[in-house]
Amino acid sequence: MTENENILAGLLQNVHSWTELKPKLSEYNTSTTDTTTKTTRAGKLFEYFTKLCFLYDSEFSEEYNCKEIYLYDEIPTDLRQKLNLPSVEHGIDLLIVDHDEQIIAVQCKFKNDETVKLNWNADKLGNFFGFARNANLHCIFSNSSDITQVAQNLTDNFKFFSYSHLQNISAATFEKMRTALIGLPVKEITKPTPHDYQ
């Protein structure tokens, strides 16, 4: 388990909702003051969290049907070369290959202020779209409430996951994430099969 995975597993302890997790992540996203030093580790932790969402939350896992999912540093060299991606990450935080071999590029953006709108320049969204040009779908996954219209209108193959999506993640999904991080088998919730007459 990496250091970030270990930290995230600890943060997920006794967490049942995004509302409970968000303040814990914010502690890893601070400016330099008299009592704190600057850290942006929350961004990396949010990337790991996003990966877990695509693996274990039904809204994401069913829609995107992940065959393979990689943090940028985990992308195999041959796939990186096929997509003409640089060795250093410049905006793509996750890469998903679905069961139809479609490539989904994901950028993750964590904000302490969830009411803020993601900005094209300040949040460097252009880097993501520039380096992810060979992807079939472009996703921005953020806890912010909105995104600039420029990003929304850039391509038809775009999806923005916002604060409202995070609010819908179930307590059972948070438990699956924590369980997966600590290396225990994840229990799948089976839906009852309706009888023929139902």
Task: Briefly describe each language-model feature range.
Residues 28, 48, 56, 64, ...:
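Sequence-level detector for tyrosine residue identity
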Residues 11, 36-39, 184:
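Homeobox/homeodomain signature
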Residues 40-133:
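Catalytic centers of nucleases
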Residues 5-9, 18, 115, 122:
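Generic N-terminal initiation segments characterized by hydrophobic and/or small/turn-forming residues
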Residues 23-51:
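Nuclease catalytic cores
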Residues 3-5, 14-18, 77-80, 129-198:
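ATP-dependent helicase/translocase motor core
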